[in-house]
């Protein structure tokens, strides 16, 4: 199957590299940052001038872009070249309602559409060990599963279009609240003479053990906020969650608290940093 990949950011570049290395047929790529394209061309990908060219040449079009408006722009650009022979997979984390709208647009051309957002961050993307939540038909899911397996090892069909994104938003909302609990309690421990690594070791033996702390303790200890998943991206996701909760008539006070931390982090200019940098917001807060 000829594959097209649009969006070679922090995650997309690593995901696409695994496809290029494992797929027997051509892989066509496009990104507005030429350096990203050049990196994949060195691996064997074929550069395209725009998204339209990718979609025209590929059987399966994959997009991995930052926001809803970017997914919408790509779909609008490629619609004229979609047909029943093609399948469109948006792996971006966007508003589920927008994704459902885009799926309807794509399906009118005869092409199939699935949302397939990913969980975990850059190291897992590089290793081909992402989790992937899929929304779409069972037939479409089975068709794309071999390609998704190039990028991930825990791949679950959640239901119809949009359901993959709903699960992704629920996942990231939970991570944001676990993270905020780690931030608050580790800051309290530090205020009372217990460093982050000692705190993390102690937590690992009890019910509070969690993947976030296990994976980020050294970065926090070293104040190394090199980005694997940015504050800006999680800020987007927590607000998608709150919008979804509002539509669902569900109160989520824990997520509202996490959103306030992310809002403050964005105001302080931390947006490009890794999301573990939210610790800087929490540890500097004073009681009301």
Feature-to-residue mapping (PLM):
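Helical "substrate-binding/catalytic lid" subdomain
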Residues: 163-288
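Rossmann-fold NAD(P) dinucleotide-binding segment
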Residues: 51-112
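NAD(P)+-binding Rossmann beta1-loop-alpha1 motif at the extreme N-terminus of oxidoreductases
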Residues: 1-62, 82, 86, 122
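Rossmann-fold dinucleotide-binding core
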Residues: 3, 94-173
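Hydrophobic beta-strand scaffold residues
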Residues: 27, 47, 113-114, 155, ...
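Residues in the short beta-alpha loop(s) of Rossmann-like NAD(P)-binding domains
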Residues: 32-33, 67, 137
